[in-house]
């Protein structure tokens, strides 16, 4: 609002309608006062004629009241004009206006009206202090009627000195400061000092503000810089440095990414047991394991993504492959195979025995020919939690919610059966048992397992869960039973069950069908296994699946491509002079040679018979049949007496039949006649 927008002349009827306290209420009486005090007038413009009186010729008290009375209307007009002609948001002042809340903007508009009233009075010749007093009195009269907080002259003064030298089109955003505090507290600091302070404070070492300010004072004294107080400097930091810049410079990329709005996902399209996720949880309870060691156990849990029910759990001293494998076995044997599975990229979860063959494992070296792990071998699609800026986003898994405050940490770790064994979530939350902070007593392993099972059941059965699927009406367990009843089932086969019951190891297969396993080795001593079915096979390397709890039982051998080959059994070393063990070994070897030889001969005989079926039959013309001699029959020989000879077989002398030379005269004569006939046949065809 500028001077030209102010109304400069009023008629007696307009003055009467304003109901000013400093003028009579009747138009006739106002006209008489104007005539008596000789107010300056001019002919009224427009219809009706008459006179209009100049505002400046009215008594000063009338002018002030009139200006205050008409300011709201003038303010409304000015606001509309400002909104139409306001600068772009690139203007720093107006950018703050665009970022302010609606409530802050409304309060700024109220303050703007008081500033326009002060400006009108000052421009009409009123002393600025009198203008503050007049505006404050009028504003407080209105606020008393509405039971609102009263305005002080000091606040008006601070607002006025904030805007009086600024262009009027920028007064509105300058009124955004909610308090009436003076702008004198704005930090006055040399640019070099400010840059020095920012480079020191906004660093990854994250120094405290107190320490940084002391360093700044020393540098300012040495360089002659002008610096404000610490509180003023803190306000300047809050005003001039965005929170995002502070987080990045002090904490890094990952912390900055945490400020970004999280993604909200829906699970409505999933079926129960279609997608599961798992993670390990370190319990805050001291447990005495069967071997006598006292540790805080770690449990691996699997959870259904759709309904959030915890499906199975296995616990041990640490997170390892066996707890993950066996807990997955519990889930699949009870509910069938899931289609998808999500886990963290940890050393235990992402090891090759569980995830071998997965190309995007990003842990351990990925080889093109490596053995398939249990999860991909079962046909389950594996998903990793994302890695952002060098750190995992484990919070993306739904099961993480179960580990937060009020979750399984309460239902299990603070179970009645575990009273006195609680270790506290951290060093500052250790319970004070009988005045001895941290004097907790461990519970036995069996008691802990009972508390774990009961705690998980209680967690699953809490009613009215506020998840997308439970919708505040059912528990995790109820939602799962309802949805799993109509879900697609994927039962597990016996061969798939064997994958879960066993671990695997890729080994070198010797020509004699033996191999060594690293599993169960002590020092350099390894278990040796053998399989007669693998002797002489073309497989150089094979995959051996074994039960880690029973390494002295049979193991199963597979090709590197996944085909099942044979079973193998562990062997024991025999003593150097153990003759009985030698005889048993020789007997087993002879039996194997005998049966292998017999099987080879049978196969050869069958192959010869099969080959004869494919040989073309020889057809002769009738005129050549008489030229072919009759087949010569083998002469009948009399039974000959079999002679034996003694042969040394290892440590035993055995009698075997002597080799008899075959007389081949009759056979050779037959061959000559047969070849002669074939030669005649060729000549006849050539003719």
UniProtKB/Swiss-Prot annotation:
Keywords: DNA excision, DNA integration, DNA recombination, DNA-binding, Transposable element, Transposition
Segments passing through the bilayer: none
GO MF entry, a single one: transposase activity
Residue ranges of every copy of the HTH Mu-type domain listed in the record: 8-74
DNA-binding region boundaries: 398-417
GO biological process, one term: DNA transposition
Presence of the UniProt keyword DNA-binding in the record: yes
PROSITE patterns cross-referenced by the UniProt entry: HTH_MU
Pfam families associated with the record: DDE_2, HTH_Tnp_Mu_1, HTH_Tnp_Mu_2, Mu-transpos_C
Record-linked InterPro entries: DNA-bd_dom_put_sf (IPR009061), Homeodomain-like_sf (IPR009057), Mu-type_HTH (IPR003314), Mu_I-gamma (IPR015126), Phage_Mu_transposase (IPR004189), RNaseH-like_sf (IPR012337), RNaseH_sf (IPR036397), Transposase-like_Mu_C (IPR015378)
The keyword DNA-binding belongs to this UniProt entry's keyword annotation: yes
Function according to Swiss-Prot or TrEMBL: This transposase is essential for integration, replication-transposition, and excision of Mu-like viral DNA.
Name of protein: Mu-like prophage FluMu transposase A
Organism expressing this protein natively: Haemophilus influenzae (strain ATCC 51907 / DSM 11121 / KW20 / Rd)
């Amino acid at each position: 609002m500028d001077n030209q927008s102010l109304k400069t002349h009023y008629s007696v009827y307009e003055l009467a309608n304003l109901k000013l306290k400093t003028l009579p209420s009747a138009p006739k009486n106002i006209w008489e006062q104007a005539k008596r005090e000789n107010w300056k007038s001019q002919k009224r413009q427009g219809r009706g004629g008459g006179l209009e009186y100049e505002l400046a010729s009215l008594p000063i008290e009338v002018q002030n009241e009139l200006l205050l009375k008409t300011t709201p209307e003038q303010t409304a007009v000015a606001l509309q004009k400002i909104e139409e002609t306001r600068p772009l948001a690139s203007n720093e002042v107006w950018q703050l206006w665009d970022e302010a809340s609606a409530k802050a903007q409304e309060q700024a508009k109220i303050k703007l009206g008081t500033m326009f009233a002060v400006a009108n009075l000052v421009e009409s010749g009123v002393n600025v202090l009198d203008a503050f007093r007049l505006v404050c009195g009028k504003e407080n009269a209105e606020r008393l009627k509405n039971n609102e907080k009263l305005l002080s002259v000091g606040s008006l003064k601070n607002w006025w000195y904030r805007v009086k030298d600024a262009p009027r089109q920028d007064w509105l955003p300058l009124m955004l400061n909610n308090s009436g505090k003076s702008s004198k507290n704005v930090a006055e600091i040399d640019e070099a000092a400010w840059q020095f302070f920012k480079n020191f404070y906004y660093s990854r070492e994250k120094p405290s503000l107190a320490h940084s300010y002391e360093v700044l004072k020393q540098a300012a004294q040495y360089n002659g810089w002008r610096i404000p107080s610490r509180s003023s400097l803190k306000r300047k930091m809050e005003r001039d440095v965005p929170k995002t810049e502070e987080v990045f410079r002090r904490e890094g990329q990952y912390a900055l990414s945490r400020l970004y709005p999280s993604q909200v996902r829906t699970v409505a399209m999933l079926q129960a047991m279609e997608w599961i996720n798992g993670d390990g949880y370190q319990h805050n309870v001291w447990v005495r394991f069967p071997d006598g060691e006292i540790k805080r156990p770690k449990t691996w849990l699997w959870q259904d993504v759709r309904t959030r029910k915890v499906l199975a759990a296995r616990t041990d001293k640490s997170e390892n492959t066996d707890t993950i494998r066996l807990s997955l076995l519990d889930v699949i044997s009870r509910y069938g195979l899931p289609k998808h599975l999500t886990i963290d990229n940890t050393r235990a979860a992402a090891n090759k025995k569980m995830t071998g063959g997965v190309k995007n494992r990003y842990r351990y070296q990925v080889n093109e020919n490596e053995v398939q792990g249990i999860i991909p071998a079962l046909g389950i699609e594996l998903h990793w939690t994302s890695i952002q800026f060098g750190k995992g986003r484990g919070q993306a898994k739904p099961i993480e919610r179960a580990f937060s405050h009020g979750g399984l940490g309460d239902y299990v770790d603070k179970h009645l059966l575990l009273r006195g064994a609680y270790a506290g979530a951290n060093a500052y939350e250790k319970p004070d048992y009988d005045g001895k902070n941290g004097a907790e007593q461990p519970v036995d392993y069996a008691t802990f397992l009972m508390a774990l099972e009961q705690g998980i059941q209680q967690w699953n059965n809490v009613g009215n869960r506020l998840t997308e699927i439970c919708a505040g009406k059912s528990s995790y367990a109820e939602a799962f039973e309802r949805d799993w009843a109509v879900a697609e089932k994927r039962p597990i086969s016996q061969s798939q069950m064997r994958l879960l019951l066993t671990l695997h190891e890729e080994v070198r297969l010797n020509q004699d069908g033996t191999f060594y396993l690293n599993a169960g080795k002590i020092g350099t001593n390894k278990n040796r296994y053998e399989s007669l079915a693998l002797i002489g096979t073309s497989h150089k390397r094979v995959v051996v699946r074994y039960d880690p709890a029973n390494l002295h039982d049979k193991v199963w051998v597979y090709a590197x491509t996944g085909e099942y080959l044979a079973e193998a059994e562990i062997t024991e070393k025999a003593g150097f002079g153990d003759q009985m063990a030698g005889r048993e070994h020789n007997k087993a070897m002879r039996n194997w040679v005998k049966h292998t030889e017999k099987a080879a001969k049978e196969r050869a005989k069958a192959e010869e018979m099969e080959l004869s079926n494919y040989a073309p039959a020889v057809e002769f013309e009738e005129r050549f049949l008489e030229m072919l001699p009759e087949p010569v029959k083998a002469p009948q020989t009399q039974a000959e007496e079999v002679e034996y000879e003694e042969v040394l077989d290892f440590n035993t002398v055995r009698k075997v039949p002597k080799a008899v030379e075959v007389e081949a005269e009759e056979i050779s004569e037959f061959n000559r006649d047969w070849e002669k006939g074939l030669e005649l046949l060729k000549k006849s065809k050539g003719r």
